[in-house]
Amino acid sequence: ALFRLNARLTERKISSVVMPAGGCPFSTLRRRKLKLAHTSGLRICQDDAFSAFWSVLEQNLQQRHDRLPVHSLEEIVRLNRLFPEEIKLYRVLDKDETVGGCVMYISGEVAHVQYIASTDRGRDMGALDLLFDCLINQIYTEKRYFDFGVSVEDGGRYLNEGLIFQKEGFGGRAVMYDTYELCLDSVDDD
C-alpha cells in the first residue's frame, strides 16, 4: 500500500459514476425533465459537427465559470480524427439547432463524459436529460462504468455542489480519484 511507503495524498477528486448494468434510477426532477424532452421534438445525433457544439460549450463555460474548454476546437477535431472510435460527439437538436450535447471518451470498460453543455433553451427543454437517458440506457449499456467526470476544482478543495447534484440526478454516485506523491529515493529495493 502506498501509505506504507510514506506516500503523501496531494489531491482527492470526486467523480460521479453510473454502472449502467444496475445503476441508480434518475431522480424525480430528471425524470420530469426527460418526459418534457420526449414531448418537445428534440432529437439526438452522433456526428463530427464539433464547431456547432463548441460554440455552445465555450459560451456556457465563459458565462457560468469564466473559463474555456481545456481543448481548443482545432485540438478536439484533430483528436477525433486520430481516434474516431474513442472520441465521439453527441448533440441534441431542436430542428437543426444544437441545444445541448457532450463529448465522450470511450475506452474498454468506461464511457467518460469529457465535455457537457446546453443552451438556456436546451436546459428548459430537458436536452441533457434526453441525451444522458439515451447514452446510459441505450448506447453504452455494455460499459461497466459511465463516468460523468469530476465535480471539484482546485485539486479537490472546492466541490461544485450544483454540478454534482446534476450528475447524481442521472444516477451517478461518488467515486474518489486520489493522487499521491511518492519520493522514490526513500523506497527500499526489497
What are these model-predicted stretches?
Residues E86-S186:
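Aromatic (often tryptophan-rich) hydrophobic motifs at membrane interfaces
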Residues A1-L42, F148-D190:
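Terminal substrate-recognition subdomain of acyl/acetyltransferases
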Residues A1-G122:
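A conserved beta-strand-loop-helix scaffold within acyl/acetyltransferase catalytic domains
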